[in-house]
Amino acid sequence: MTNANGNLKKCPITISSYTLGTEVSFPKRVKVAAENGFDGISLRAENYVDALAAGLTDEDMLRILDEHNMKVTEVEYITQWGTAEDRTAEQQKKEQTTFHMARLFGVKHINCGLLEKIPEEQIIVALGELCDRAEELIIGLEFMPYSGVADLQAAWRVAEACGRDNAQLICDTWHWARANQTAESIKNVPADRIVSIQLCDVHETPYKELREESLHDRLAPGEGYGDTVGFAKILKEHGVNPRVMGVEVISDSMVATGLEYAALKVYNATKKVLDEAWPEISPR
């Protein structure tokens, strides 16, 4: 797998954007990721827009990546695509921004989710339309237990029913654990339709408001009660060959300790999990 800046590992270990918080600059994000072992960074549309507002150009961003031998390996996050009413001018602009980012950085897939709870028939139609707008890019649909696509089975139903080859899926440890997914949950999902994996972990007791927990209080892989090792083994044994192994530890308390600490902590935790569960793609 390659991007516009050169060669990549087959499955780059990628630090997700939220793992380093929302306030960090583009140069700092790249530097911290590179210095703490990661192969790539995930970049949200908001991160990209902030970089432009800070005076960087596309060429500047590519140069900064090249200087650190770093890649953007994931682009995110498309939401509010389920109905015509939700697709406001702002939403459409953000969607086009993610398409531009993916092509600029040579990323083949874009992460998306649907928070709105609408009829499944409408989700199927809307997902197909989103895939058509994405053209050659893959749409990675992420199931979330508090969303309109609550579990892996629902995600695969709509991806299959929309009839687009570029409708694929994302599996995240946090959502997997909180949606009570098991090896049985993945049995009917083709392995080649899972485009990426995101590692983290969960507390023993869920918050009353799951989205609040998801966006503020995740744990590093293998350090909680979500059985991250077991999760990774299930995906490996199913035959999944992800384009990206993301590490999405969204934690206010961890970011508050410092970006370097956060990056090194989640890198080491990820390596420990993958050494046990999936040594073929564990960082060396």
PLM region spans:
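Active-site acidic/histidine proton-transfer and metal-coordination neighborhood
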Residues: 3, 7, 27, 31, ...
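Boundary/entry segment of secreted carbohydrate-active catalytic domains
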Residues: 3-24, 76
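Structural preference for beta-strand elements that scaffold enzyme active sites
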Residues: 10-14, 40-42, 71-76, 107-111, ...
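Conserved, mostly hydrophobic/aromatic
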Residues: 15, 33, 41, 65, ...
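Active-site beta-loop-alpha junctions enriched in small/polar residues
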Residues: 16-20, 44-48, 77-80, 115-117, ...
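Gly/Pro-rich active-site loop or hairpin
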Residues: 30, 52, 86-88, 152-156, ...
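Structural motif
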Residues: 36, 44, 104-105, 192, ...
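Glycine-rich, proline-tolerant flexible connector loops at the mouths of alpha/beta enzymes
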Residues: 42-66, 117
